[in-house]
From Swiss-Prot:
CDD domains: PanC. Catalyzes the condensation of pantoate with beta-alanine in an ATP-dependent reaction via a pantoyl-adenylate intermediate. The reaction proceeds by a bi uni uni bi ping pong mechanism. GO terms for cellular component: cytosol. Keywords: ATP-binding, Cytoplasm, Ligase, Nucleotide-binding, Pantothenate biosynthesis. Beta-alanine binds at residue 61. This is Pantothenate synthetase. Pfam families: Pantoate_ligase. (R)-pantoate binds at residues 61, 153. ATP binds at residues 30-37, 147-150, 176, 184-187. The gene is panC. Belongs to the pantothenate synthetase family.
């Protein structure tokens, strides 16, 4: 595995790979690799001849009161995991090479990036869209693998790729869960043992939604309220939001229509730790 830190060098390598008809897959991360990331790399490895992994803790997607400086950066451990996962190129630039002093241009995501996570984290998705676009231009992949765990981020990226006519296929990888249903996440390290033991409540909420829909219950607002109550009644937990959205448009939905696909989005706090989860629901 070759480690690259300079954007121009990575671009030159990617251009040469394309000229040599190599099929490139990219996985973009902020490091602190876990089983979820490794599943994305595995999917890329199965789908592409050359796999590029990016590690970059993107400052433009962190808010003023968020944990940019506390975000874990176990680089040597990440290198070992990436090597074992048979990554071909690890692109790990410094912030100054991606956002030099005179950098001014950013992307605006519109309404999709302003609700739910975007409402609670103003500017977050603009930062995500900007860095993803930059990394796509630098690594020049044919496919890019993103996890379904960050469902709104995935929707924003798909919308951006379509709107900007970017020449890349976005592939979604399923959520990887722990035994109790907790979605694997870099933020799980902040959970106490007690919080981790009860963290399956979010997945239980998804299961409750699936069961309710299977029983022909159609009022999604009522189901969402029931899940909120489930979370609120779990010691140490408080819900932030529980919302159903139309899977195609990613707009809030209140009544389920037969045969239509929805996405249940959940965000909740365990103490000071904020976690998100989601599940696909078919009416």
């Amino acid at each position: 595995m070759q480690i690259i830190t300079e954007p121009r060098q990575m671009q030159a390598i990617a251009e040469k790979l394309r000229l040599n008809r190599q099929f490139i897959g990219v996985v973009m991360t902020m490091g602190a690799l876990h089983e979820g990331h490794l599943s994305l790399i595995k999917l890329a490895r199965q789908s592409a001849g050359t796999v590029i992994l990016t590690i970059f803790v993107n400052p433009s997607q962190f808010g003023a009161n968020e944990d940019l400086h506390q975000y874990p950066r176990p680089f040597e451990q990440d290198v070992a995991l990436a090597t074992a996962a048979e990554v071909d190129y690890l692109f790990a630039p410094e912030a100054g090479t991606i956002y030099p002093e005179n950098h001014q241009t950013t992307l605006q995501c519109g309404a999709l990036g302003e609700r739910l996570e975007g409402e609670r984290r103003p500017g977050h998705f603009n930062g995500v869209a900007t860095i993803v676009t930059k990394l796509l231009h630098i690594t020049k992949p044919h496919i890019a693998i993103f996890g379904e765990k960050d469902a709104q981020q995935l929707a924003v990226i798909r919308r951006m790729v379509e709107d900007l006519n970017l020449d890349v296929k976005i592939i979604a990888a399923p959520i990887i869960r722990e035994e109790n249903g907790l979605a694997v996440s870099s933020r799980n390290i902040y959970l106490s043992n007690t919080e981790r033991s009860t963290a399956g409540i979010l997945y239980q909420g998804i299961c409750h939604a699936e069961k309710s829909i299977a029983e022909q219950k159609k009022n999604l607002s009522v189901i969402a309220a029931e899940i909120e109550q489930m979370i609120a009644s779990t010691p140490g937990w408080r819900p932030d939001y529980v919302v159903f959205v139309d899977e195609e448009r990613f707009e809030p939905a209140e009544i389920a229509e037969e045969g239509k696909e929805y996405r249940l989005l959940l965000a909740a706090y365990a103490g000071k730790v904020r976690l998100i989860d989601n599940g696909k629901i078919v009416a």
